[in-house]
């Protein structure tokens, strides 16, 4: 690595600052740390969250007869038994043992029995933010779900408002108006009753109390009022009952409307004044009064009893039962939980209108005040009061993230509730003297829920490891599907659509095409998740028109009230906003505002988009649909044999490669003292300790691509034998044995080397003189990077610490003989010959030798009935040697399985003892290379019970064979740029036939110019032009998203590189040597080879497996199936009158079993006439009709019934014609 010169990088960014980027896999790591709290030194002082909260919510457990109680003290985490790599090799789970200190207290004697109880193995997150489950790397994707809290919505069709109380766990409570204009409450979407019944059950018993709770009132005079004054009160409603004092009769009930008759009655009764409801905005709104009329009760006791009889029909209603039921539904922590988030949402919703009641409130159950406030809010919505709005459920203030830690906690809660049930059962059954925590606790439910969650949950996914970007994006993915989320079929347009609150939190571009569009999203680059699970994005604060250095993270609902300037706003030297009017964002609008009215400013232009999208240069010139494809296709790029960083990038490449944790990053400041292909040794500052970093070499990823790390740091070796004559910071001088002087410079580009020898020291050729100085990584408490550590080794698709998913190739945009018609791509033979787009793919093949009823299977070289050629690459134990070239059908591991043995005769026993296994009755069950695969064996792993390896039950020995294959670029392979410009290789042209430039340089690739204008992805044109300048000048460009190079910048560099400003060149036809008529646009474009390789897709079948029922060939490459001839193909053959071809295809080539066997015989014997039989699908049809009670009878021409099964045998002898009749059963 010594002496390697780095490319100079030119960054066009004026505003973009990547230093503020959070750690990109922080969402995974922080969430799991929150759950586990493994770094807390005092185990008894963990915070009430995650795993600790699960234990605390389950314990203490009291026995049903109250004679003992089980308490929890704290949990202890052990060390994982194996390293992550060992787990991958042995198909094990990377987990640590979880133990809990549990006390059993016997109440009668006060005796305390304390034990440390093993609670099972808990899967642990690796440093990369992944889990290893049964040897496979998996990622738990964060879920985007509706936040708990109270939500108000508006139904446009019915023109009504509704309110919903959504808890984290427990019964849902809803309020809405029914068809009769009554405000009703619904519990769990089933039980319906007037909302006032619930309000009265909370202690506000009379109608008057309820009305006074929600409305203000005003007294109006009756006695002595003029007719004009009395007219004003007509149509208004009383807030209290008006009673005739003499008779005690209620003349007007609370909520009654005042009319002329009522006024005359009031005058007769000599009522001086009435207290009337003051409706908001003076509009009469009777929905609450209608509910009071409907509920039919007028005191607390009647209300709560009626509530109980509605909820628990058929059960006896007493005040005690009713109160218990109401408490169970909403006020008990055991059955109802809003979560911290739900309480926070309720407080922030009502604090605005009722600050005294809600500030500082921490209760996680519902409170009567919450229900009252909800009813008040919905009444104000119906009255159209100012500052009362329905909620937007798609707003990110109402959707939150459930990350790994929370998802595991929720699963464990269900497991622990089952454990609690088992403990209570065992407490009653077992003798009190013998009981201990260990005997009472069953850990089966816990291990079951853990295994189910990691193994089969929709949110625990097999990690996409195609390349580092795919891995990083997978960890940052947000999924709105899954348990407790949306379903693909019911999600409408609104949920999927881009919302203004997504700005800086979720990427508006990166989402799949197809049914999951808008449901699976990606976090924006700068976004982070706060303690409540809401997405936050950073802004620079603006005070009095001056941009401060302070950065604040805002959630979507906090952002609602502010005006936010764009990152591109012009700032002077003092940091003040220059222009008088500045374009800002406010909710969904873009108003112009004075600098003094602005509170915040965007941090960087790329905070809108995700990491994938931020890797597209000139994104601002691409259409959004193509940018979406570009983002998604970068994740499918196959790591190449020779990585090359793009000439034109965005500056995000380095950070994406670093944060993906695919490279090896140095942990402590120091000096590299030794480097080889497998290890890097770094001596720490001070020289007392050293760290050894092990490199991963040629391992298979989940997707079969090759994972290989290569060192990029180095040491300085002496090239001669001699003595060190001079050592300084700048250089080391070595005097050779013959007196020659050799100088070694210690500063090359950005790499600084530190001497590890001293003057006068004897050195031999190859001795280490100096090591590269490396910086250690430093993180803050949140896991964000304060100081980036030196990258010691590149991973796959990384070039010198820079993400390198493809290669820079010389391209021209011109049609060429139709070979690049419709997005096809013409490439030069040089690309194939020089392995420009070659990649290594690794396949794993596994065989297990099991114990069978007839004896054990054996891995052996002694396999009956095979030629010596089949054994040529097997070793003496029957396993293939490393380095062997294998083709389809070759034996990888020889294995025999015993057949059913009869009693052996003495002669057979003698033969068996002389000739060994071959004479024995065994069947060949060797592992062979499957169809369509070939390559070189690169690794073999053997595990057996004899070597104390852990194997699944019944398995005696297991062998894994890894076969690698170099895949060159082929016709049919899919390739793409970063702008959604994808295509398929149509032809590999000889280099001499490719178009060439005036200086004789042949092109690498020819693309169709018609693919650009209609798709509106002009970013590729700018990239190609700037790429040519980069190639000529020997530099690399970084053009950040929305903050990159402008046309003038591109022109300036083209001038510097002596290139035409339009990047058009005179090209010559390689076949004729004649120039093309027009000049052609040429330059260097970055092209990726995608994981859609033609070799994985191409497939042919002669004979193969058939479906059991229909006897038709199976479908698909995986089943070695055939090509389906569907009804449309049948129509086409019918149209041409090709009756014999059609008959052949529908019978002997498909499901005519007899005909299939006969045609084989005919081909062997050379007979050309063949008579088709009856297709098996006809028999299936007959049986299907019989299942529908239709009696199908087959008759010959004379009307005799023919049995179809006999008929098959008869068919070859008989030439009779058959007719079919259908007789419907009466």
Curated annotation (Swiss-Prot):
The keyword Transcription applies. Its EC number is 2.7.7.6. SUPFAM superfamilies: beta and beta-prime subunits of DNA dependent RNA-polymerase. Keywords: DNA-directed RNA polymerase, Nucleotidyltransferase, Transcription, Transferase. One of its GO terms (molecular function) is ribonucleoside binding. It catalyses: RNA(n) + a ribonucleoside 5'-triphosphate = RNA(n+1) + diphosphate. InterPro entries: DNA-dir_RNA_pol_bsu_ext_1_sf, DNA-dir_RNA_pol_bsu_external_1, DNA-dir_RNA_pol_su2, DNA-dir_RNAP_su2_dom, DNA-dir_RNAP_su2_hyb_sf, RNA_pol_bsu_bac, RNA_pol_bsu_CS, RNA_pol_bsu_protrusion. The keyword Plastid does not apply. It comes from the Bacteria. It is an enzyme of class 2 (transferase). CDD domains: RNA_pol_B_RPB2. GO terms for cellular component: DNA-directed RNA polymerase complex. One of its GO terms (biological process) is DNA-templated transcription. DNA-dependent RNA polymerase catalyzes the transcription of DNA into RNA using the four ribonucleoside triphosphates as substrates. NCBIfam families: rpoB (TIGR02013). HAMAP family: RNApol_bact_RpoB. Belongs to the RNA polymerase beta chain family. The RNAP catalytic core consists of 2 alpha, 1 beta, 1 beta' and 1 omega subunit. When a sigma factor is associated with the core the holoenzyme is formed, which can initiate transcription. This is DNA-directed RNA polymerase subunit beta. It comes from Leptospira interrogans serogroup Icterohaemorrhagiae serovar copenhageni (strain Fiocruz L1-130). The gene is rpoB.
